[in-house]
């Protein structure tokens, strides 16, 4: 065991194994006009929002950016542009461990539905970390919390019809 650790540390020092990212990022890809790679610093420069959730009797205040604002920044059609072929688009949110959840593009547009989804980077005033990951989605109106995905690393926009 001790030998393995020394080998691992030696390979890292030699640059043969990558060190962990010091600045986690979120990729926004797929059917977008401009693919994005966002850091916590990038999100901090965008308009902020707060959502309060209750789970297991505990309240949490999440702070972040509305997901539709991130999609808008990537050039995804929303608002009056979300019609016709664009309505057949959906979004896959993917976590670091491969867990995925899906939203129709209409579900993410506040002009279609009153269920804004938060891309959170802080909870109760502190940056998310550890098991939460650096980014997570908070879906306050979903009854089960299964789509409030944590450890978020990628958002992919997919168009069903070509």
Language model segments and positions:
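Hydrophobic h-region of N-terminal signal peptides that target proteins for export
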Residues: 10-20
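N-terminal intrinsically disordered, low-complexity segments enriched in P/E/S/T
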Residues: 2, 20-162
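N-terminal secretory signal peptides and thylakoid transit peptides that target proteins
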Residues: 1-12
């Amino acid at each position: 065991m001790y030998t393995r650790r020394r080998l691992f540390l030696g390979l890292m020092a030699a640059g043969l194994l990558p060190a962990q990212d010091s600045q986690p990022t979120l990729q926004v890809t797929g059917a977008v006009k401009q693919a994005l790679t966002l850091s916590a610093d990038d999100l901090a420069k965008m308009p902020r929002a707060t959502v309060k959730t209750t789970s297991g009797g505990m309240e949490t205040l999440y702070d972040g950016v509305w997901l539709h604002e991130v999609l808008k920044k990537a050039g995804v059609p929303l608002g009056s542009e979300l019609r016709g072929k664009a309505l057949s688009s959906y979004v896959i949110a993917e976590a670091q461990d491969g867990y995925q959840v899906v939203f129709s593009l209409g579900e993410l547009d506040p002009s279609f539905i009153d269920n804004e989804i938060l891309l959170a980077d802080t909870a109760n005033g502190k940056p998310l970390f550890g098991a939460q990951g650096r980014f997570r989605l908070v879906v306050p109106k979903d009854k089960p919390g299964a789509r409030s995905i944590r450890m978020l690393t990628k958002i992919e926009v997919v168009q069903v019809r070509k």
